[in-house]
Amino acid sequence: MNILGIGSALPEQVVSNQQLEEFLDTSDEWITSRTGITRRRVMKESELTRLALAASQRALLDAGISGQDLDMILVATTMGDYVFPSTACLIQEGLHAACPAMDLHAACAGFIYALDTADSFIKAGKAQHILVVGAEAITRLANWEDRATCVLFGDGAGAVVVGPGEGLLSVRLTARTDRDALYMLAEPGNNPFTRKPDEAPGGVRMQGQDVFRFAVSQSIEDLNQVAAQAGRTVQEMDWVLLHQANRRIIDAVRQRLKLDPARMPGNIHRTGNTSAASIPLLLDEMYRAGLLMPGQLIAMSAFGAGLVSGACVLRWGKEPPKTLTPAEDLFSPPANIKP
Amino acid sequence: MENIMSKVAEALAERRGSDPQEITAETRFNDLALDSLDVAELVMDLEDAFNVTIDITQVDGTVGDLVRVIQEAAQ
């Protein structure tokens, strides 16, 4: 599998930490020191389909193909604008495509799960061109009265078009179920024949320390393993992209793997945690800024509710775009530098 | 016990960017201005250093309490 085209889209509305101070018992200092997040993009209305479609159209344009050339649409998402039809079907309509389309749910690791799925379809000869999208409206799932979690999230979408090739050098997917660490109950509906669950739905619930420890240790294990499968070490990678969940996780992984901060770009400070969208969003910013060169090795690692994780090593094959878009501060200082 | 104490003090000092000498067995975690993720990272550091599993809720009370927990787990 090779990445033939890439694109992304963010909602226009920016919500700063200061705006959160107005209705939550929190502070910019508290949020920044614990997460590295200073602002995030939040949808103004139910517009995930529109964002995912915009990201997809950019990826198709970049790949130089049209919707009719697609053999499959795979969307990694926790929940789209609709329970059904899938976001993938709604994108299919927008792209005037005629191929099979489905959503895939592996929380924040969804994009890498979807990449591996796409690679398998291509290797099996069942598809030539697959659109793989990570799209999340995670802010509408958050409990905006819980200051420990709602400050973390942002919305967005990133997409790639993949085709046959040898660019995916290694991949690892894991699942180790731990519901209590990170979960959100489904709405029970109003079925009169089913007793309501004892616990009322109340947005995202997270045991922060447990998730932090899982994320750091799993990401290190995954990165070491996918690098070794690719015949390299993590330290030999040109770029290491971590799911932008929390700057403290990224820093903890970087310190333990002794990685150069200049090889670990990030945008969490201005996007927040965009779940399955975070890796393709970051990759697209790097590509459009001209940072990605043909032949470069990129390790990617994501982790999330499940608990699940996914990691891979890609050999980048595309030339930089003709018109570059300077990326806004992709290398901000670590969050955990204490005065 | 002293060896564990000095390693815990070093790990704590590194996390806080302070001098290990300032940390004694009587030092209370509440007085160290650690946030929840500092505690998570400290536990990960100590689990790696001593090859033990530490219940994170036991990082409470004094540094000496944690040293005893690690010593018991290591036996």
Language model: regions and residue ranges:
Chain A
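Condensing-enzyme catalytic core mediating Claisen C-C bond formation in acyl metabolism
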Residues: 1-45, 146-213, 217, 221, ...
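Short beta-strand segments
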Residues: 7, 76, 105, 130-136, ...
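Claisen-condensing/thiolase-fold acyl-transfer catalytic domains that form or cleave C-C bonds
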Residues: 49, 53-56, 60, 79-80, ...
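Anion-binding (especially nucleotide phosphate/pyrophosphate-binding) glycine-rich loop
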Residues: 62, 66-98
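Flexible, glycine-rich active-site loops centered on histidine and acidic residues
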Residues: 123-157
